[in-house]
């Protein structure tokens, strides 16, 4: 019975012993995954931890994470954590001692001492910390519980400091001082401010601060002490270690094969060094590098590093094979099979690369070939062969009529960039370009092509290219390799006459002398086209938007989109009506027969514009006199020409010249073409007017009443035509005239 009773009493004891053993074994396991390892932006590695007791080694390593602002604190010493290093270092925030900074008194405000003492405390103050003082006329003192440890004095007297160069390097006493803390200091530290007798008056010496910190300061980056007072704290470095006297602390860590008799212990992954501090032993553990990295305080926390993936393995092995080993790597000669695979890989890669380049090259060749075929097709369709034949017959004029390649014009206009557009009209878009020789040109890209008129177009290009007159925009050549022909003209930079004459926002006022000079130049150009050229050429669209001005206000007639050449024995052209409202010859509109006198009528409207400064058509005028020509004829009939002369030139003009030009304009606007002067007569008469050898007699001859009634096409008339026509070719803005265009022939 006694034996049975004894056995029953031993069972609970055995269970207790087994429980202790199991607990001891379980303590060697990793902390559970539920343990939080981050607080804010600060990592909390084991042996530190947040949460339950199994998340950290012992209470000295417990970290409390403030749920409001995610700020970590070391629980036992109640200090905010800055960072944790597994190399045995933590940084905490320690308060700043201050005097005379904000309280109105010079009495120091000393914070509670830094206390890291206690049974089993692993923390101590390292010798990386400095005692720093910033301010004037005081001493900063660091003390333990019973005695002063170190101190330094800060003064604003430059005689008490070293040279300027020395002051710039360290805080050596001028406005700031610092001193290193000796090793082996107690675990309770305070920082005080001592003010000499006579300097403790309120406000005397200003703000003074003193603090411990592991940060480095010099007189260059130390500003006013108020900055440190406002900051409120400084970073202090604490060392930490394991107390080997308690097996409960040493048992859970990975590097646990240690004994008190050996100064150094290591296994294949991690090592621990032993030492003594304040009468007790400690050890510091770390992963053996460079072969391992990780956390040595966790079972299996040090993991192997694959050096073959790093520069150290690649650089050392070079042409050999890098083989990763536990804790290191080895360079071994490449095996034949392995070398064979490498060669095969290089060959396959090279073949694929060559294949890709071949496919790309073939694609570019096909694209280039297609483009070349398309360009040749367009060249033939647009009359390129005929133009070549024409140029071959006129060897002396080859340069004047050049055939440009599409590549040249694409380069000149930056691939017809929309930012290069000078203007747009019914016949096409005009771009500003620069040729390889530096010449600035206007490149007109047509919108439509009439394949039935190819031969006529080529003949006219050749004729127009031979025109060489200083008051006519020069056709430099064309490109026929595009879907629609592209014409290249000389560039005229100063815009069109319409804009300069009618734009009220323009500060420039065109004087009468300039207007008369422009009229003479236009007349001379038209006279040249009608009589002096190889074949008479009728412009068919004379208007102020087609008169361009260069930098010297020299007129240049442009836009030959609707012009036609005739043989010498021809007196007129029978065509579909083309032109612009306000400028179209009424006789031409009724008969569809365009003569040289039709250009004279349009020029007469331009003369009236120069005289009056008004636009060729306006809805402001009365219904019957909406057109400028009719309005002018009505003024002539009522003998009030002077009333409609432009106010901007009345005060400075020669009135005899004005009346003479008005008389000439009236004759140009005669309804019957036979009664109008020709352009040569107009040009000579204008020259005579300018030389003041012409007497107008002030009186302007008037035609009969029948002429007056049928002088101009009214807007009330019903025409079976559309309302779209070419705009100005080279000016930088859209046409500003109120003239409404008719539909032109489909031209180039």
From Swiss-Prot:
Regulation: induction: Induced by INA.
MF (Gene Ontology): ATP binding; calcium ion binding; polysaccharide binding; protein serine kinase activity; protein serine/threonine kinase activity
Residues engaged in binding ATP: 422-430, 444
Stretches the record annotates as Atypical EGF-like: 270-331
GO terms of biological process kind: cell surface receptor signaling pathway; protein autophosphorylation
Main location: membrane
Residue ranges of domain Protein kinase in the record: 416-689
Residue positions with a glycan: 66, 83, 160, 199-200, 221, 257
Domain of life the protein comes from: Eukaryota
Phosphotyrosine: residues bearing it: 489, 588
Phosphothreonine: residues bearing it: 575, 580
Side of membrane Cytoplasmic, spans: 363-748
CDD domains: STKc_IRAK
Active site as annotated: 541 (proton acceptor)
Presence of the UniProt keyword Signal in the record: yes
Enzymatic class: transferase
Disulfide bond entries: 272-285, 308-322, 317-331
Tissues in which the UniProt entry reports expression: Slightly expressed in the whole plant.
Extracellular membrane side: 28-341
Protein's job: Serine/threonine-protein kinase that may function as a signaling receptor of extracellular matrix component.
Annotated family: Belongs to the protein kinase superfamily. Ser/Thr protein kinase family.
Domain notes: The EGF-like region is specific to this family of proteins and seems to consist of the C-terminal of an EGF-like domain fused to the N-terminal of another one.
Name of the featured protein: Wall-associated receptor kinase-like 2
Organism: Arabidopsis thaliana
């Amino acid at each position: 019975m006694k034996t049975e009773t004894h056995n029953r009493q031993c069972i609970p004891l055995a269970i207790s012993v087994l429980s202790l053993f199991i607990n001891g074994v379980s303590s060697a396991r990793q902390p559970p995954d539920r343990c939080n390892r981050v607080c804010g932006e600060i990592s909390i590695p084991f042996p530190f931890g947040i949460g339950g007791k199994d998340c950290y080694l012992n209470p000295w390593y417990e970290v409390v994470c403030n749920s409001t602002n995610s700020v970590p604190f070391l629980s036992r010493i109640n200090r905010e954590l800055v960072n944790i290093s597994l190399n045995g270092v933590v940084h905490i925030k320690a308060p700043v001692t201050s005097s005379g900074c904000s309280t109105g008194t010079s009495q120091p405000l000393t914070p509670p001492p830094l206390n890291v003492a206690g049974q089993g405390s692993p923390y101590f103050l390292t010798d990386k910390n400095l005692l720093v003082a910033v301010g004037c006329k005081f001493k900063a003192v660091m003390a333990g519980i019973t005695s002063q440890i170190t101190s330094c004095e800060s003064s604003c007297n430059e005689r008490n400091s070293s040279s300027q160069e020395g002051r710039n390097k360290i805080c050596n006493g001028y406005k700031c001082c610092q001193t290193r803390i000796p090793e082996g200091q107690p675990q309770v530290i305070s920082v005080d401010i001592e003010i000499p007798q006579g300097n403790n008056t309120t406000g005397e010496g200003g703000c003074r601060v003193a603090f411990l910190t592991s940060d480095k300061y010099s007189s260059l980056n130390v500003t006013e002490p108020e900055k440190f007072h406002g900051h409120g704290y400084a970073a202090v470095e604490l060392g930490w270690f394991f107390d080997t006297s308690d097996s409960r602390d040493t048992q859970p860590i990975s590097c646990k094969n240690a004994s008190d008799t050996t100064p150094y212990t290591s296994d294949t992954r991690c090592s621990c060094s032993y030492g003594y501090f304040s009468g007790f032993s400690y050890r510091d553990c770390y992963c053996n590098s460079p072969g391992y990295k990780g956390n040595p305080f966790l079972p299996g926390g040090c993991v192997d590093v694959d050096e073959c993936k790093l520069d150290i393995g690649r650089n050392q092995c070079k042409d050999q094979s890098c083989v990763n080993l536990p804790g290191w790597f080895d360079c071994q000669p490449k095996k034949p099979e392995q070398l064979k695979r490498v060669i095969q890989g290089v060959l396959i890669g090279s073949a694929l690369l060559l294949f890709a380049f071949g496919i790309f090259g073939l694609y570019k060749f096909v694209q280039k070939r297609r483009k070349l075929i398309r360009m040749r097709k367009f060249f033939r369709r647009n009359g390129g062969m005929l133009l070549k034949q024409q140029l071959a017959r006129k060897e002396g004029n080859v340069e004047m009529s050049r055939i440009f390649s599409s590549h040249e014009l694409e380069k000149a206009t930056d691939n017809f960039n929309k930012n290069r557009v000078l203007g747009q009209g019914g016949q096409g878009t005009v771009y500003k370009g620069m040729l390889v020789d530096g010449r600035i040109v206007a490149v007109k890209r047509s919108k439509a092509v009439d394949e039935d008129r190819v031969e006529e177009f080529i003949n006219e290009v050749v004729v127009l290219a031979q025109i060489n007159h200083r008051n006519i925009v020069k056709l430099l050549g064309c490109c026929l390799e595009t879907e629609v022909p592209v014409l290249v003209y000389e560039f005229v930079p100063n815009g069109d006459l319409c804009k300069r004459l009618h734009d009220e926002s323009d500060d420039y006022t065109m004087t009468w002398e300039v207007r008369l000079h422009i009229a003479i130049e236009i007349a001379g150009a038209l006279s040249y086209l009608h009589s002096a050229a190889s074949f008479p050429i009728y412009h068919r669209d004379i208007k102020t938007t087609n008169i361009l001005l260069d930098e010297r206000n020299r007129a240049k007639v442009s836009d030959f989109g609707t012009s036609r050449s005739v043989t010498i024995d021809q007196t007129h052209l029978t065509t579909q009506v083309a032109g612009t409202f306000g400028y179209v010859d009424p006789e031409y509109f009724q008969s569809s027969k365009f003569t040289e006198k039709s250009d004279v009528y349009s020029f007469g409207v331009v003369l009236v514009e120069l005289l009056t400064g008004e636009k060729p058509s306006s809805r402001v005028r009365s219904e019957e006199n909406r057109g400028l020509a009719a309005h002018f004829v009505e003024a002539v009939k009522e003998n009030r020409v002077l009333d409609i002369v432009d106010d901007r030139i009345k005060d400075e003009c020669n009135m005899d010249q004005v009346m003479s030009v008005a008389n000439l304009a009236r004759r140009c606007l005669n309804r019957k073409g036979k009664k109008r002067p020709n352009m040569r007569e107009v040009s000579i008469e204008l020259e005579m007017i300018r030389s003041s050898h012409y007497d107008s007699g002030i009186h302007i001859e008037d035609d009969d009443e029948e002429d007056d009634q049928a002088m101009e096409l009214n807007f009330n008339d019903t025409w079976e035509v559309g309302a779209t026509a070419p705009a100005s070719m080279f000016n930088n803005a859209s046409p500003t005239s109120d003239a409404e265009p008719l539909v032109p022939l489909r031209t180039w």
